[in-house]
């Protein structure tokens, strides 16, 4: 796969619970299963593209915690180059996902953690990385101003851009 993909996005640790139904306010419900896995739209896109053989760089922010270690392990295993700022004063993102067994409907609570602190200045610090890309991708899990900054840098350099408006 020729070219290089640069992705601006966040990592979250997905914590997924399956239950027959959603609990009511104030109720504790016994679930059927639990799984923890790497998540975050940008991180997932980077991992998927790298597994398909692409040269991928991910620009993101993490806390300094166990979820950050999961992120780095995931990216290393997939072959993703990480351009990441670690914040000692913030947590890595996490998502609570509840899946109802019968309907397979889900409800998600997302805490973007350190990913919510990505600024245009953080993105501008990676301008040289973005300008070397064939494709620049981003989503809207990190702040809109950061995504806009990345898109502007990429377009000015003639890099093809992709905006996934998720999680909208």
Name each region found by the language model.
Residues 1-61, 68-70, 76:
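Glycine-rich phosphate/adenosyl-contacting loop at the front of the ribokinase-like
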Residues 61-64, 143:
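Short beta->alpha junction loops/turns
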Residues 29-44, 66, 87-91, 113, ...:
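Residues at secondary-structure transition points
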Residues 1-11, 57, 72-87, 99-168:
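Ribokinase/PfkB-type carbohydrate-kinase core domain
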Residues 31-32, 39, 61, 94, ...:
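Thr-Gly-centered strand-to-loop micro-motif
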Residues 52, 78, 90-93:
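Short, basic and Ser/Thr-rich N-terminal targeting/leader segments
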Residues 47, 94-98, 107:
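Short beta-strand scaffold segments in enzyme catalytic cores
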């Amino acid at each position: 796969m020729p070219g290089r993909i640069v992705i601006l996005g966040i990592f979250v640790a997905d914590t997924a619970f399956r239950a027959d139904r959603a609990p009511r306010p104030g109720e504790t419900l016994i679930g059927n299963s639990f799984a923890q896995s790497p998540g975050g739209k940008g991180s997932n896109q980077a991992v998927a593209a790298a597994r398909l053989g692409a040269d991928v760089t991910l620009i993101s922010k993490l806390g300094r915690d166990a979820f950050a270690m999961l992120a780095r392990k995931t990216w290393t295993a997939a072959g993703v180059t990480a351009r990441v700022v670690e914040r000692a004063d913030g947590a890595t993102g996490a998502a609570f996902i509840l899946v109802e067994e019968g309907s397979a409907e889900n409800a998600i609570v997302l805490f973007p953690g350190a990913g919510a602190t990505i600024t245009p200045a953080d993105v501008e610090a990676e301008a040289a990385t973005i300008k070397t890309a064939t494709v620049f991708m981003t989503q809207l899990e990190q702040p809109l101003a950061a995504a806009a900054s990345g898109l502007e840098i990429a377009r000015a350099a003639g890099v093809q851009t992709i905006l996934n408006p998720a999680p909208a």
